[in-house]
Amino acid sequence: MYKGLTQNLQAAIASGKNPDVVQMGYSFLNYAAENFQSVNLNDAFAKSGDPNFLKDNFLPNVLELAQTEDGKQVGLPYSISVPVLYYNPEIFKAAGLTEAPKTWAEVKTYAKTIKDKTGNMGFFMQEYADNWAQQAIIESNGGVMLKKVNGKVQAGFDTPEAAEAFQLMADMVKDGSGLHATNEEGFQAYLSGKLGMVCTTIGKRANFEKTAKFPVKVATFPEFEGKPVRVAAGGNFLMVFSKDAAKEKAACEFIKYLQSPEALVKWSTGTGYLPPRKGIAEDPKGFKKMAEENKNIQVALSLMPKAVKWASFPGANGLQAEQMLIDVRDVILSGEKPAAEALKETAKKVNDLL
């Protein structure tokens, strides 16, 4: 989704038709900052007469989600999501499972139990055209997506920790308890009561709760035993590409409206995303009532302190590097190659690009 938006933006700018406000995926932060001329939002809000809007309304760690390494505020976080584990309590009951899994070892065991006792598929992890969910499982096992060597960004996923995380997914597919499929197929299997667990964004919550034929339950992102959970903040941030001062000021006013408590609660209600603005979760006009009444939202909010920046491939070849890691996911899950071998080969190709 965000890759397509980025490519559309590239085409629009090339034709001289700059959009004023754009939603950009966090994983394309470095690519967008290095390849597109955007407006520095600190400067823009200062010129619009509200120089303290950002620091007064957003926590520093939230603002950092849309900052380059040198601290330039190229955007403003708008939608925030974290990966969670949705499960079907009716399938769990039929399989004799009484509580949600807390570790990835338990997820694997639960998936096999569900398959053996109910005939339903046990587990599916989202397969969007990005590496967001994969980053969470790699880094929760102590690995990293990207690293710096002598000041240069390189692939960091050619490690035993990353291979173990990927291989766990592949092993579930191999034994028939895990599903390797399109998102549409995986999500539909869950919603129709034929899949026990799906790991995907809390941004799917509203749709799942409305569509499922059973009460949707959410559990926190599982851990690798003894290791801290680290989940990438997903979603998107707002960038401004206005060419003149009047449009730039209007863009700032539009962003302030989008970030108002009333607008954010509508956005969160409709999408399932978590709001980025400080205090919204406690604001009676904002998210407070909704969060208090929905335990699934409470689970997602509890993951916010464990959120880290979504790894963003830099440079002109950033999109191509991102695609290589997406492609190797299919190689591993299909059983074509073991995770360790496939990741090592892909890391070398990515490093040659970067």
Role assignments for model-derived ranges:
Residues 111-112, 151-180:
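Glycine-centered hinge/linker elements that transmit conformational signals in sensory
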Residues 29-31, 136, 167-253:
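Extracytoplasmic/periplasmic substrate-binding proteins
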Residues 296-346:
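C-terminal capping/gating helix-and-loop segments adjacent to ligand/active sites or protein-protein/ligand interfaces
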Residues 255-279:
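Periplasmic-binding protein-like
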Residues 69-78, 83, 93, 105-154, ...:
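Extracytoplasmic/periplasmic solute-binding protein
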Residues 1-57, 90-95, 99-102, 196-197, ...:
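Extracytoplasmic "Venus flytrap"/periplasmic binding protein-like
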Residues 29-82, 108, 217-219, 301-304:
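Hinge/lid segment of periplasmic solute-binding proteins
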Residues 42-58, 123, 143-164, 210-211, ...:
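Short, solvent-exposed loop/beta-turn-alpha elements that line the ligand-binding surface or hinge
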